[in-house]
């Protein structure tokens, strides 16, 4: 009995410590991928992306180690009111050695307060750096609506027929603005702050199993006093988005239409590039003139076709029409079927095609890419992760144009512009060729 009594304080202390640890538990989430690959003609794994396309089909076609490590915690709660602190640090290396030093990217650090406004139950106030309501196509790693960055907002306001969200974020360009210099010389190497103001109305039930989301984004260059932009800079622009999501075959289908103007056309996802400049090989700012418009029509989804088959798919048309004729027309179509041999083993195939036409030359670049992978994953869904896969990829391309980045923009009037593949006896784009790669990769999110 004496021994039991002596052990009691220790047991109480341990229990209190466990309860305290549970109360202060930190949420750990993230994403990572890494692997090793070879190229059929020799050397390390090559990855294949069509010149002018903004993404590539990713299965068996990723050549880097990438990770996002998220730590977060609910730091205060009283009734239904709470504060949550969230962080995210990302890393990317070329996966060529054991020791690969890299500077981390501090991508998220924000606080979200839920139900803090009595007359707006269910809403969230937030401020800080944040991945904000991002919309993407997983199989091509393409974010078509993403205003992430430092910002603040009020989201998920219940308006009866949907949820209203308001936000403002910042996306600064590395250069583009200039202060006065002697002899009226401007270098345009100062950072340009771009503000984006976002309004969304989501979760509107428009048909059985279907919801509609509408959004408007306005972006503008926010100059400091006595600074100026390059003559003809776009300064501002708009992005309009409509997305219909339909529940179908134990999955979903998303149909998206987007239209953007001027500064919102460069990235086409909601981030503004108001100064409209870039830097050449000599770090000299040159005008890329993103005045114009963009139209994007996109359909993508993931479905289940019986007990053994799942499939992802995408089809997209995008037309960037710039006043300087340096835009592109890009269309892409692809599928990723998955056959499940057991609840944890599957065979996955990805077939994708890209075609990009240059507005300036009228020429087209195209690429076919096919990957076959044997995969072991934590579950029987096409979304199940972690996954370990061995793969073989074949790509064939024929490119008739490329971008001219020879010399610098002060002496090369075509710098940064699309030119035919054999322009001035040179070689632009990737030509007409094909290649095999093979390897192994892990992918995880949690």
Swiss-Prot record:
GO terms, biological process? monoatomic ion transport
Q: Where is this site: Important in sugar transport?
A: 143
Q: Which reaction does it catalyse?
A: beta-maltose(in) = beta-maltose(out)
Q: Does the keyword Transmembrane apply?
A: yes
Membrane-topology descriptor: Multi-pass membrane protein
Expression induction per the record is:
By maltose.
Feature type site, description Greasy slide, important in sugar transport: 31, 66, 99, 252, 383, 445
Tell me the leader sequence span: 1-25
Pfam families xrefs: LamB
Q: Which residues lie on this side of the membrane: Extracellular?
A: 36-64, 94-104, 131-148, 174-191, 223-234, 264-290, 324-326, 360-362, 401-430
Periplasmic topology ranges: 26, 79-80, 116-122, 160-161, 206-209, 249-250, 306-307, 342-343, 379-385, 446
Q: Which UniProt keywords are listed?
A: Cell outer membrane, Disulfide bond, Ion transport, Membrane, Porin, Signal, Sugar transport, Transmembrane, Transmembrane beta strand, Transport
Q: What is the top-level taxon of the source organism?
A: Bacteria
Asked if the keyword Transferase belongs to this entry, the reply reads no
Name the coiled-coil region(s).
none
Where found in the cell?
A: Cell outer membrane
InterPro entries from the UniProt entry: G_neg_Bact_CarbUptk_Porin, Maltoporin, Porin_LamB, Porin_LamB_sf
Q: Where are the membrane-spanning stretches? A: 27-35, 65-78, 81-93, 105-115, 123-130, 149-159, 162-173, 192-205, 210-222, 235-248, 251-263, 291-305, 308-323, 327-341, 344-359, 363-378, 386-400, 431-445
User: What SUPFAM superfamilies does the entry give?
Assistant: Porins
Under Gene Ontology molecular function, one entry of this record is: maltose transporting porin activity
Cross-referenced NCBIfam families: PRK09360.1
- Which HAMAP family does UniProt cross-reference here? LamB (MF_01301)
Q: Which family does it belong to?
A: Belongs to the porin LamB (TC 1.B.3) family.
Q: What does this protein do?
A: Involved in the transport of maltose and maltodextrins.
Protein name from the UniProt record: Maltoporin
């Amino acid at each position: 009995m004496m021994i039991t009594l002596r052990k009691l304080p220790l047991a109480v202390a341990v229990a209190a410590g466990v309860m305290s640890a549970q109360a202060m538990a930190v949420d750990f989430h993230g994403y990572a991928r890494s692997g090793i690959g070879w190229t059929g003609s020799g050397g390390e794994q090559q990855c294949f992306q069509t010149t002018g396309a903004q993404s590539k089909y990713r299965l068996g076609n990723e050549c880097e180690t990438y990770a996002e490590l998220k730590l977060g915690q609910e730091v205060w709660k009283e009734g239904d009111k709470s504060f949550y602190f969230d962080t995210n640090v990302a890393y990317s290396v070329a996966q060529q050695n054991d020791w690969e030093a890299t500077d981390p990217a501090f991508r998220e650090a924000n606080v979200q307060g839920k139900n803090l406004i009595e007359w707006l139950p269910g809403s969230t106030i937030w401020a800080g750096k944040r991945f904000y309501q991002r919309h993407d196509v997983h199989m091509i790693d393409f974010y078509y609506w993403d205003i992430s960055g430092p910002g603040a907002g009020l989201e998920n306001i219940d308006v009866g027929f949907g949820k209203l969200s308001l936000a403002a974020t910042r996306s600064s360009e590395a250069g583009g603005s200039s202060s006065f210099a002697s002899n009226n010389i401007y270098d345009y190497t100062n950072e340009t702050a771009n503000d984006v103001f976002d309004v969304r109305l989501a979760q509107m039930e428009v048909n059985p199993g279907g919801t509609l989301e509408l959004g408007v984004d306005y972006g503008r260059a926010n100059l400091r006093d006595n600074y100026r932009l390059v003559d003809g800079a776009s300064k501002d622009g708009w992005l309009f988005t409509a997305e219909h999501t339909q529940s179908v075959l134990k999955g979903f289908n998303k149909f998206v239409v987007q239209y953007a103007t001027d500064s919102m056309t460069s990235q086409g996802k909601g981030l503004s590039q108001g100064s409209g400049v870039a830097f050449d090989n000599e770090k000299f700012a040159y005008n890329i003139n993103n005045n114009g418009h963009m139209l994007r029509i996109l359909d993508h989804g993931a479905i289940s076709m019986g007990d053994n088959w799942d499939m992802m798919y995408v089809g997209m048309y995008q037309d960037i029409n710039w006043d300087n004729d340096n835009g592109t027309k890009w269309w892409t179509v692809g599928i990723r079927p998955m056959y499940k041999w057991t609840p944890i083993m599957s065979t996955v195939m990805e077939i994708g095609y890209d075609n990009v036409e240059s507005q300036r030359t009228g020429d087209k670049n195209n690429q076919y890419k096919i990957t076959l992978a044997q995969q072991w994953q934590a579950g029987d869904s096409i979304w199940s992760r972690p996954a370990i896969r061995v793969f073989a990829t074949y790509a064939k391309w024929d490119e008739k144009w490329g971008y001219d980045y020879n010399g610098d923009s002060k002496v090369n009037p075509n710098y940064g512009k699309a030119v035919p593949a054999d322009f001035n006896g040179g070689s632009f784009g990737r030509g007409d060729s094909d290649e095999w790669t093979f390897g192994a990769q892990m992918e995880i999110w949690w």
